[in-house]
Amino acid sequence: LAGVTLLAAATLAACSGSSSNAKGEKTFSYIYETDPDNLNYLTTGKAATANITSNVIDGLLENDRYGNFVSSMAEDWSVSKDGLTYTYTLRKDAKWYTSEGEEYAEVKAQDFVTGLKYAADKKSDGLYLVQESIKGLDAYVKGEITDFSQVGIKALDDYTVQYTLNKPESFWNSKTTMGVLAPVNEEFLNSKGDDFAKGTDPSSILYNGPFLLKSIVAKSSVEFEKNPNYWDKD
């Protein structure tokens, strides 16, 4: 078993202990069983990776302590009367940051389109969750169509992303919390190439969540730091 240390942070789920120092900084620790072998939240189905990236990557929605869906990257959303079209309005104060906490770019609707295309092209472990849900995605994954613009995800503008489904799914919003539908910045993705999310290098991904990953020491510790510029840092 290995431990996780979270520095200067708010509460983390499944924490087993906490402490404070003279500066008022808080440290939370919990036990995890397996080291992650990569940070690719878009493609891996491994819990070891998700346990790390769920603290540093935000999707459109998240669950509150009661299991209700609340805003995350999306500040508002709506569904068409026929239940086939879901439209999400992104908050304009959400940003991407490097592992050093430097602002990289705004989080935009195109990031969600880029994320799903990447997941489909890389045959993500999580595709089964959405492949038959999103219009045209199954055909794209199978190679029956090659133009991703025919898939039912669109960036209507910088802050509006829309999904078109094959049939109504009352549980669709739950899927927006999954890694396969998470965003990624296209410029950063292209700059990294095959090194994107490779291994456990914190600098191999960008961060739009409440914490920044600082280090992973195999069979020893994972260290996070509170993102001081996170839109909901307080």
Model-derived regions, located:
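N-terminal lobe/hinge region of extracytoplasmic solute-binding protein
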Residues: 31-81, 206
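Short, well-ordered beta-strand elements
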Residues: 24-34, 85-89, 112-115, 161-162, ...
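Bacterial signal peptide processing site
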Residues: 16-18
